[in-house]
Amino acid sequence: MPEPGKKPVSAFSKKPRSVEVAAGSPAVFEAETERAGVKVRWQRGGSDISASNKYGLATEGTRHTLTVREVGPADQGSYAVIAGSSKVKFDLKVIEAEKAEPMLAPAPAPAEATGAPGEAPAPAAELGESAPSPKGSSSAALNGPTPGAPDDPIGLFVMRPQDGEVTVGGSITFSARVAGASLLKPPVVKWFKGKWVDLSSKVGQHLQLHDSYDRASKVYLFELHITDAQPAFTGSYRCEVSTKDKFDCSNFNLTVHEAMGTGDLDLLSAFRRTSLAGGGRRISDSHEDTGILDFSSLLKKRDSFRTPRDSKLEAPAEEDVWEILRQAPPSEYERIAFQYGVTDLRGMLKRLKGMRRDEKKSTAFQKKLEPAYQVSKGHKIRLTVELADHDAEVKWLKNGQEIQMSGSKYIFESIGAKRTLTISQCSLADDAAYQCVVGGEKCSTELFVKEPPVLITRPLEDQLVMVGQRVEFECEVSEEGAQVKWLKDGVELTREETFKYRFKKDGQRHHLIINEAMLEDAGHYALCTSGGQALAELIVQEKKLEVYQSIADLMVGAKDQAVFKCEVSDENVRGVWLKNGKELVPDSRIKVSHIGRVHKLTIDDVTPADEADYSFVPEGFACNLSAKLHFMEVKIDFVPRQEPPKIHLDCPGRIPDTIVVVAGNKLRLDVPISGDPAPTVIWQKAITQGNKAPARPAPDAPEDTGDSDEWVFDKKLLCETEGRVRVETTKDRSIFTVEGAEKEDEGVYTVTVKNPVGEDQVNLTVKVIDVPDAPAAPKISNVGEDSCTVQWEPPAYDGGQPILGYILERKKKKSYRWMRLNFDLIQELSHEARRMIEGVVYEMRVYAVNAIGMSRPSPASQPFMPIGPPSEPTHLAVEDVSDTTVSLKWRPPERVGAGGLDGYSVEYCPEGCSEWVAALQGLTEHTSILVKDLPTGARLLFRVRAHNMAGPGAPVTTTEPVTVQEILQRPRLQLPRHLRQTIQKKVGEPVNLLIPFQGKPRPQVTWTKEGQPLAGEEVSIRNSPTDTILFIRAARRVHSGTYQVTVRIENMEDKATLVLQVVDKPSPPQDLRVTDAWGLNVALEWKPPQDVGNTELWGYTVQKADKKTMEWFTVLEHYRRTHCVVPELIIGNGYYFRVFSQNMVGFSDRAATTKEPVFIPRPGITYEPPNYKALDFSEAPSFTQPLVNRSVIAGYTAMLCCAVRGSPKPKISWFKNGLDLGEDARFRMFSKQGVLTLEIRKPCPFDGGIYVCRATNLQGEARCECRLEVRVPQ
């Protein structure tokens, strides 16, 4: 059996070909096989041909010859040659020998032959072919041999079925006769179509099987009747006949031709208007118009040039003028008509124009490929054809090249007559033209491979950059190597000469890079794929440096540390520190640092020389940040003993100014003191409660001092010497330090010094200023197509400094990058954001900015989508009008927007009025509406508007006013197509017949059955304004009949008729009996069931059961006859038989069963044991797997392996460099199931060399060798 998917290999190297031979000549067929000695059989009509006076068989090596001597008409037909499993068919066609006959006038047309006196049609014997049977029927047995003269002495057939031809719609009968004189029982005949289709299961309207027996001649006649032939019946058929010990079969073919068209008519007779009866006298048709073209004068003139000897010439073979006309261009029609004597040119042209061109019917293909196929990339596709010959070989071509089997890419299948090509894992390379070739015929198709849409898995992000910065857009798609397109504001981007745009692919990621962004690069950038697009906005701003935190004045003492710190908006900006206008050079005491956006100047061990003006100048910007360093000098004066304590502060009137410190900075209060003895210093902070200063939008807003009332509840003692807030006291001063000032450190601090002589006290006010608190979440309003309005409230705390303005940011909902919308501070509490993308969900947030810096961001706003109102709905029309209602319908607007539609609003107003009234409360999601409670007779205008998140769109209004008044409409039933034929329902099934109708006002509906009104509760009628329903909950047989429905409006009505057929299971067959039993066969006979279930009987199912097990097995299904033969029963067993009847509902509930078992007798059998020839299994040794060269490492055990076969078991010997290793203990030899192993224990360099394995038995000797190299590890 050939490997699945591969074409079987033919046994013939040269195949015989069909030939045409003249009658009486010999015909020679030659075939060559692949090898000599192959048994070859020659067949004709399915029977073997043996050497005789008629047939000659010869064989020379691989050449085989069949000679048919003195070929006659009876030898014409189909032949075959068989070698092994290969079978080749060929045909022999016999041509009649040419005879010299005088030229005969063409036969007249049938219409003229019956009407012209003195003319008679030629007899059938002169025409050379038999007349067709009436109504297109023919018989395949007419040309066969008669029953009295059997031509097959070897087989069972007296007469075999012959090949037949029939036209579409005609009938044909195939007959087979079997001699029964020598048969003990009737033969079993089976008819097949193709290889496997048993025609007994196809018996029906188009196919019938008949058999009879002639007792006089003792001949069985079997007939196959085909009626109303269809083109699908064309093909090869087979008749098999079998008896107890004989078997024979016969093959024949059926060809169904298309119905005969006008092209099959005798063109010369149909369009010749004159006859040459009686000495060439011209007879004209009296009804012909004298204006019709007539070539008779030209024909006479042509005949005058002929010589007398022309009449003695042989009559040439008649040509098919119709084929000549079909293939000739229209310009040649007159010449052809003149040449072949066609005088009625106008009638010929009219008939030719009405003819359709018959397509050439394929003889090799029963079913061809479709014109085109489509498959998605990565899927598989199956291309299937169906052949007329089951044994034909096919070739599959791709773009003209034959497809070879390669792995699992292409799979070839052959199942019966079907040939299938399966292409797995289709790629773009498989998009091509494919052809299936059978012999000289082929059918073509095209395969289109569709790529799946490339989807956006990670969209683009909006970006905000400065002029000159690098921009990189990144997007991720679903397919690697996908083709994408970059657009800017709708224009495709390409690689320019300046290489401004760079496109980069990294797997599924695609990058667009702009090395140096310019102001003109701002806009919307999009990446388009076959499955969608990603859109992002690029905003390019001119460079502008913002100062988030400026440097502040410092007052430090000797040996202290001074730190100036500032923060700018750009972390890449460098700067220069100046001291009194001169650049400051860092050293071991002065350090300059730049970390991110923070620039810091640190001076250790401050000296009086460090007191100066310090400035920070950013590079590239006209900006200058300045502050002053104050050095606190301690003066030592001589104080006599017993001096009262005193606090030395340079504060006029002892009312110190407020000390301002930025949150996060270090606060150090160095208070000089004096006194003798040394005073005790006490630091206290007053705990107060007062009003917070409200956030002010502008720095120049007036300050209300009347609302700053404070109440002092208590004082907190500060005495810690370590920690964030600490106090350090020396002999001449007290130092109060706060690391990282916070808002809670703000307040009034009291310094008290005491000694026995007295005390002194000073209050110091410290104010901590900070960035503002984060504002509340902004609110979004007035959302438009690409804009919205953002509103927010001031922060609860302004950080002790007036609010300078606000900064606004936005981002896409699914993104993580916030984009700044403004560089200039917004002074108001609202802003209109523009240049947004419609249909994209955004979020907004806001920052507050004061002199100290920028606050934390506010919480994000509620997500919102910029969207514009939809356009007006389309195709507004009035569907129906009554006395109080109007039905409207429309279609959705052309532009809906990304947010979809919320619904539609419908309004109306009287003609001439401008006030519109809502037709319904709220919105409707449907595109139709019934407006009720309208005044009768009013003329109203209607309009419809579409609504979405952005609000209502433009309205669409009816072109003319609608008059609210009922329109009279004739009643009409619209019977569905499936109700126009007989309605079949099974017993117990519900019946629900819905019939729509039209008519205004509402028609009156009436149902009748067989002319009588419907009665009973089982049948119910339900009517609505537009349809009526006949409903039966459970159908019964009594419900079958003809129903009529009538709709009536006044004197107008319409009727429709329905036929209901309620079917049930049939009753079982009657009188089942065994008519005969012989050999292994039993003949059964029964009568049809009494009740067929009110429908056509499909057939019978015959089953058998062994008496021992009583397990039923099906013998025949869908059997149409009332008698059958059950073959192949087991000898010695008893059988019961039963038969079910079947229709469209199912099988009968019960079966007709035989009452008594039928026993199959056991005949005597003589066992003859078979003789077997002793087989010699001896075989010389041979290595199936030889030794291979190896390189091993010294000290590690190595193995050499090979495999050997032989019978008897060979003796194995191992050699190294010619020395036998059998006595060496360092080598171990193993042999298991033919696998030989030599184990070398811990080899050393001396073990290297050539190793040989020798196998020896009585049949011979074999050896193999290899080289072993032992390497010493380095």
From Swiss-Prot:
Disease: Cardiomyopathy, familial hypertrophic, 4: A hereditary heart disorder characterized by ventricular hypertrophy, which is usually asymmetric and often involves the interventricular septum. The symptoms include dyspnea, syncope, collapse, palpitations, and chest pain. They can be readily provoked by exercise. The disorder has inter- and intrafamilial variability ranging from benign to malignant forms with high risk of cardiac failure and sudden cardiac death. Cardiomyopathy, dilated, 1MM: A disorder characterized by ventricular dilation and impaired systolic function, resulting in congestive heart failure and arrhythmia. Patients are at risk of premature death.
Outcome of substituting residue 733 to C: In CMH4; uncertain significance
Modified residues (Phosphothreonine): 607
PROSITE patterns on file: FN3, IG_LIKE
N-acetylmethionine sites (modified residues): 1
Chain positions with Phosphoserine modification: 47, 275, 284, 304, 311, 427, 550
Disulfide bonds, paired cysteine numbers: 436-443
Domain Fibronectin type-III stretches: 774-870, 872-967, 1068-1163
Source organism of the structure: Homo sapiens (Human)
Effect of residue 654 to H: In CMH4; uncertain significance; as well folded and stable as the wild-type
Outcome recorded upon mutating residue 833 to T: In CMH4 and CMD1MM
Binding residues for Zn(2+): 208, 210, 223, 225
GO molecular function list: actin binding; ATPase activator activity; identical protein binding; metal ion binding; myosin binding; myosin heavy chain binding; structural constituent of muscle; titin binding
Residue ranges occupied by any Ig-like C2-type domain in the UniProt entry: 153-256, 362-452, 453-543, 544-633, 645-771, 971-1065, 1181-1274
Biological process, per Gene Ontology: cardiac muscle contraction; cell adhesion; heart morphogenesis; regulation of cardiac muscle cell contraction; regulation of muscle filament sliding; regulation of striated muscle contraction; sarcomere organization; ventricular cardiac muscle tissue morphogenesis
UniProt GO cellular component terms: A band; C zone; cardiac myofibril; cytosol; M band; sarcomere; striated muscle myosin thick filament
UniProt biased composition (Low complexity): 107-141
Family: Belongs to the immunoglobulin superfamily. MyBP family.
Source taxon at top rank: Eukaryota
Region (Disordered): 107-153
Keywords: Acetylation, Actin-binding, Cardiomyopathy, Cell adhesion, Disease variant, Disulfide bond, Immunoglobulin domain, Metal-binding, Methylation, Muscle protein, Phosphoprotein, Repeat, Thick filament, Ubl conjugation, Zinc
Modified residues (Omega-N-methylarginine): 1241
Name of the protein described by the UniProt record: Myosin-binding protein C, cardiac-type
Mutation effect (residue 1248 to R): In CMH4; uncertain significance
